[in-house]
Amino acid sequence: VAGNVTKEVSYKAEIDLCDEGKIKMLDAYTRIKPWKTLQLTIGQERVPFTIDAHRSPHQQYFANRSFIAKQVGNVRDVGAEIGYTWNVGFPIVVNAGIFNGSGLTNQKDYWTKGVNYSAKAQFLFPNVNLVLSTQKIKPSDITVTMYDGGITFHKGGFIAEAEYLYKHYSKDAFHDVHAFDGFVCYDIPVANPKSLVRKVSPLARYDFMSDHSDGTRYGGSDTELGALKINDYKRHRVTGGVTLSLAKPFISDIRINY
């Protein structure tokens, strides 16, 4: 649910009714836009980091999210964010914010333990988007710093995207994590205006991740006792499929993937 209270003030509330069998509150924030190039956001949201992890569920291209979006870079949190847009012949969009740093599953007061931040810059060239971002969180006594870079090419019905994420843990608590996601998609419009299906989109993806830890220790300890647990083991994956986009008034996609 999203809407405007006034011209300058908007809101969004988004709920996932089945995230691995659980109902989760995803977004719950207020956004103030005092003028066209500036916006302020406060509340619970997807932090400004990565390309694919920043997409809401209905904006995803595949039935299952990439490893960057689901495991390595998947961070929603509570905080405050500022965004500004410049036009230097092409738009440059910069978003940065300070956040709780513990994620949605463990909302504690982390402000006294240091600043947890996220920042993202988008360079929107004609047909090409370049995105660079960084984030720092502290889910336990370990500081986790992430760096992400990605590029998207889009022309007509064709889109290609490649993204790389690097994750570093302080105190040498865990080895560095690497993740990659790349996909191609092509939209084929259906000529018959009376057809239930408006477009057909064949697509393919390759993604990879090394052994990954979310920064918490076995037993849930906030001290240096115990090793960081491996939440997700190293894996490679190739996904292919087709998306059937149905007619309006509601945007509805049927995603068939293997």
Predicted regions and their residues:
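Phosphate-binding glycine-rich loops and adjacent basic patches that engage nucleotide phosphates
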Residues: 39-46, 75-80, 110-115, 141-149, ...
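Outer-membrane beta-barrel pore domains
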Residues: 29-33, 55, 129-258
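Solvent-exposed loop/turn segments connecting transmembrane beta-strands
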Residues: 15-25, 72-75, 104-113, 137-144, ...
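Outer membrane beta-barrel
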Residues: 1-101, 113-115, 121-129, 183-187, ...
